[in-house]
Each structure stands twice: as structure tokens, then as C-alpha cells.
Amino acid sequence: MITVDRDGKRFGNEALSYHDFGRQMLDHHATEQEVYAWIIGDKRLMDKYGIGYAKPWPVPRGFFHRIGFLHMGRSIADLAQNSGVDPQGLERTIERFNRDALAGKDGEFGRGSTAYNHFRGDMEHTPNPNLAPLAKGPFNAAKEQMGDIG
């Protein structure tokens, strides 16, 4: 899973707390009218974890596609087009992220480099429990907006 802006670029460590990641999101979008990002996942992620309200397999996800909560694409380019994200930016971001995930080190934002990150990871995944390539479609995206978590 990665989170990207409308240009298809990551802007922070997605394994941080909601508060810290929210701060990164606000800082990154400081000059923009609307603060939002896209959570991107592949088939493996959707089947094992889901995204937000869209729960993992075997829970059907058609409803979430119909109401616009989830956007789907058979390829990264399709997903970008269906969600309004820059296709070239998203392709480049996922290529870099996948290389880093296979190597087990997030060269951009250090995801998986702290005990807190590891606690929020999947210990069955190695070499870094916080990094897995986004490799197999269909790919899904959900719009993420700032909110109050209590």
C-alpha cells in the first residue's frame, strides 16, 4: 500500500501514526485548496487487508466501486485514469516503490525503519514487514481525506 497525491507521488511514510501522517499530508498540500490523497493497493493487499470500509476477501467489493469509494484499474495506467491521478507520476512512483520493497528499504521516507513502523507491519513479509511490491492487478484506490478520529 502506498499513499500518493494527485501527481502520483508519495509524500511521506505511510506507516506513521494517523496524527503524524496527517501532519505530513497537511504540510504537503499546504498551498492547495483541497487536502486529499489516494491510498493505492494491489490484489494481494485487497484480498488480505482491504482498504478502509472495503474489507478483505471474501467480502464483496462491488458496492464500494458502484458508490465511488473504490476506483479500480486492471493496470496502473487504468487506475490512474479512473481516479484522476497523473499516470506517468504514478507509474514512476510504483516502479521506485517496488524496487525499494524488493530490497527491503524505503529510500524515500524510511518506511519500516522504526519499531513503531514494524509494529504496524505484516511480520510474515520479509525482508521488511512494511514494504511489499504493488505487483498484481487489479489495482484499487480510495480517496483519503483529513478527518477527526476522536
Which residues are covered by each model-predicted region?
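A glycine-rich dinucleotide-binding beta-alpha-beta segment and adjacent secondary-structure elements
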Residues: 89-150
